[in-house]
């Protein structure tokens, strides 16, 4: 996810994206512990996306 995509989103869209990414991270961690996850780099990529979304949310709110 690029920062330019997030810049154009509203607070509601960013909040929804944050929830979506958090659920995806939960599923990836579950797959990791059950041995089904092949691409472990996906976890860190999703965590970075969550951080980007949270950064834009704090900019908008505050």
From Swiss-Prot:
Source organism, top-level taxon: Bacteria
Keyword S-adenosyl-L-methionine: no
Gene Ontology terms, MF aspect: structural constituent of ribosome
GO biological process terms held by the UniProt record: translation
TM regions (residue ranges): none
Protein keywords: Ribonucleoprotein, Ribosomal protein
One Pfam short name: Ribosomal_L29
Cellular compartments per GO CC: cytosolic large ribosomal subunit
InterPro entries named among the record's database cross-references: Ribosomal_protein_uL29, Ribosomal_uL29, Ribosomal_uL29_CS, Ribosomal_uL29_sf
Matches recorded under HAMAP family: Ribosomal_uL29 (MF_00374)
Record-linked NCBIfam families: L29 (TIGR00012)
Family: Belongs to the universal ribosomal protein uL29 family.
Protein name in the entry: Large ribosomal subunit protein uL29
Organism listed in the record: Geobacter metallireducens (strain ATCC 53774 / DSM 7210 / GS-15)
């Amino acid at each position: 996810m690029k920062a330019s995509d997030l810049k154009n989103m509203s607070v509601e869209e960013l909040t929804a994206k944050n929830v979506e990414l958090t659920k995806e991270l939960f599923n990836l961690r579950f797959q990791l512990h059950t041995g089904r996850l092949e691409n472990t780099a996906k976890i860190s990529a999703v965590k970075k996306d969550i951080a980007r979304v949270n950064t834009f949310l704090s900019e908008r709110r505050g």
